[in-house]
């Protein structure tokens, strides 16, 4: 059981107590249900790869988003990973295409630009006549580093913008840190 708990703890966001709860739950299930779970996990791992265009997860050569003709092919939103892409898709606001970098530049972790899907992004922008690139990367040192690096590479090809950062809905100003408040002020927009 300890081995199973250890494996669950390796998943993002799963601590020791949740890992133990998941392990106990699985061990209390009928064997056929556990087998179905294991089969689904192995099938997903072997059948799901990356979209050839945007590097989002996909079981087909092109993901569901890239294969939709109604999407705006002249607009690309750059994200670090598929979780960020899915978060943006939940808003139903963005109607363009995406590009998943596969991480952020982080020299401290040994992740340089060559380890990310940056070269295919630049090739895609140069080849496809992109009208704008939106950078939707996390507001962190790594996100800022990656954004500055990408903006410098892409500016000769098309306009580059970055999503606004600021305060989450329902938050109190007094509890926000200085960087968040500064970004919120910088990203202000006129009232409609």
UniProtKB/Swiss-Prot annotation:
SS bond list: none
Residue ranges covered by zinc fingers (C4-type): 51-66
Stretches assigned to the Toprim domain: 74-168
Keywords: DNA damage, DNA recombination, DNA repair, Metal-binding, Zinc, Zinc-finger
GO molecular function list: DNA binding; zinc ion binding
CDD domains documented for this protein: TOPRIM_recR (cd01025)
SMART domains named among the record's database cross-references: TOPRIM
SUPFAM superfamilies: Recombination protein RecR
Biological-process GO terms, alphabetical: DNA recombination; DNA repair
A Pfam short name: Toprim_4
Summary of the function given for this chain in its UniProt record: May play a role in DNA repair. It seems to be involved in an RecBC-independent recombinational process of DNA repair. It may act with RecF and RecO.
Family, similarity comment: Belongs to the RecR family.
Protein name, as recorded: Recombination protein RecR
Organism: Synechococcus sp. (strain CC9902)
């Amino acid at each position: 059981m300890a081995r199973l708990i250890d494996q669950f703890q390796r998943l993002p966001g799963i601590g020791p107590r949740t890992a133990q709860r998941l392990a106990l739950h699985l061990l209390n299930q009928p064997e056929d249900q556990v087998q179905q779970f294991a089969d689904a996990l192995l099938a997903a791992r072997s059948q799901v790869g990356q979209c050839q265009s945007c590097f989002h997860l996909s079981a087909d050569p092109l993901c569901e988003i890239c294969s939709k003709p109604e999407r705006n092919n002249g607009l690309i939103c750059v994200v670090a990973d598929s979780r960020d892409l899915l978060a943006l898709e939940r808003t139903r606001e963005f109607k363009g295409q995406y590009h998943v970098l596969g991480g952020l530049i982080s020299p401290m972790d040994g992740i340089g630009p060559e380890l990310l899907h940056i070269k295919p992004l630049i090739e895609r922008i140069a080849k496809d006549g992109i009208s704008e690139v939106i950078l939707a990367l996390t507001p962190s040192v790594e996100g800022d580093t990656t954004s500055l690096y990408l903006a410098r590479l892409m500016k000769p090809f098309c306009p580059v913008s970055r999503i606004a950062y600021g305060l989450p809905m329902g938050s109190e100003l007094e509890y926000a840190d200085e960087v968040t408040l500064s970004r919120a002020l910088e990203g202000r927009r006129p009232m409609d």
